[in-house]
C-alpha cells in the first residue's frame, strides 16, 4: 500500500517514542487516535515492519498490539536519524524509590491466654459419625446382595 512519507514518518515516530502501538481492527476508521493518520495506513505500515522482523504483533479482541524488537529500534533510529542515546519509553529503566532501611520490625508480644482458646480448642464431634460406625457396601439398585 502506498503511504505518504509524512504519514509513514508520523507512524514511525509514534512507534519509536513509546516502543508500542495499539490499533483497533477498523479499516474504515478515518484517523488513528494517537497518530492522527488513517487507521488503515497505521495497520499496513505496522504489518510491513512486522514482516521484516522489526515488530511483534499480537491480536486480541479486535485490537492489534505492536511491540518493537531490538532490530526494530535500530532500524527506526536509522530511519528517523536519531542518536544512539535516544531509546523508546519501554526500554528505559524506571526509577523506583529506595526501600526504607529500618530493619525488621519488632515481634509483637503475645498473651498466652488469648492464644490458648485458639490453639487448644476442644474437639467438637457435631455431625461426626459414632465411634462404632462400620460402613459397608450392600450393592446397588436391582443387584443381588452378596452375603
Curated annotation (Swiss-Prot):
Keywords of this entry: Cytoplasm, Ribonucleoprotein, Ribosomal protein
Family of this protein: Belongs to the eukaryotic ribosomal protein eS10 family.
Keyword Cytoplasm: yes
Ranges of biased composition (kind: Basic and acidic residues): 103-127
Its job: Component of the ribosome, a large ribonucleoprotein complex responsible for the synthesis of proteins in the cell. The small ribosomal subunit (SSU) binds messenger RNAs (mRNAs) and translates the encoded message by selecting cognate aminoacyl-transfer RNA (tRNA) molecules. The large subunit (LSU) contains the ribosomal catalytic site termed the peptidyl transferase center (PTC), which catalyzes the formation of peptide bonds, thereby polymerizing the amino acids delivered by tRNAs into a polypeptide chain.
Subcellular location as annotated: Cytoplasm
InterPro entries: Plectin_eS10_N, Ribosomal_eS10, WH-like_DNA-bd_sf
UniProt subunit comment: Component of the small ribosomal subunit (SSU). Mature yeast ribosomes consist of a small (40S) and a large (60S) subunit. The 40S small subunit contains 1 molecule of ribosomal RNA (18S rRNA) and at least 33 different proteins. The large 60S subunit contains 3 rRNA molecules (25S, 5.8S and 5S rRNA) and at least 46 different proteins. eS10 interacts with GCN1 (via middle region); this interaction is direct and promotes GCN2 kinase activity.
Listed name of the protein: Small ribosomal subunit protein eS10B
Gene Ontology molecular-function annotations: RNA binding; structural constituent of ribosome
Transmembrane helix keyword on record: no
Note: There are 2 genes for eS10 in S.pombe.
Superkingdom of the source species: Eukaryota
Region described as Disordered: spans on this chain: 90-147
Gene Ontology cellular component annotations, sorted alphabetically: cytosol; cytosolic small ribosomal subunit
Pfam family, one: S10_plectin
Gene3D superfamilies given in the database record: Winged helix-like DNA-binding domain superfamily/Winged helix DNA-binding domain
Gene that produces this protein: rps1002
BP GO annotations: cytoplasmic translation
Amino acid at each position: 500500500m502506498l503511504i505518504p512519507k509524512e504519514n509513514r514518518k508520523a507512524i514511525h515516530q509514534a512507534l519509536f517514542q513509546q516502543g508500542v502501538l495499539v490499533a483497533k481492527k477498523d479499516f474504515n476508521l478515518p484517523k488513528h487516535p494517537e497518530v492522527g493518520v488513517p487507521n488503515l495506513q497505521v495497520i499496513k505500515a505496522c504489518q510491513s515492519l512486522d514482516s521484516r522482523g522489526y515488530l511483534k504483533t499480537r491480536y486480541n479482541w479486535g485490537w492489534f498490539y505492536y511491540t518493537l524488537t531490538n532490530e526494530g529500534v535500530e532500524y527506526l533510529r536509522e530511519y528517523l536519524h536519531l542518536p544512539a542515546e535516544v531509546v523508546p519509553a519501554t526500554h528505559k529503566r524506571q526509577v523506583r524509590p529506595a526501600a526504607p532501611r529500618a530493619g525488621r520490625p519488632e515481634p509483637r508480644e503475645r498473651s498466652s491466654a488469648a492464644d490458648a482458646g485458639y490453639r487448644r480448642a476442644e474437639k467438637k464431634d457435631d455431625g461426626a459419625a459414632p465411634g462404632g460406625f462400620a460402613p459397608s457396601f450392600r450393592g446397588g439398585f436391582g443387584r443381588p446382595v452378596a452375603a
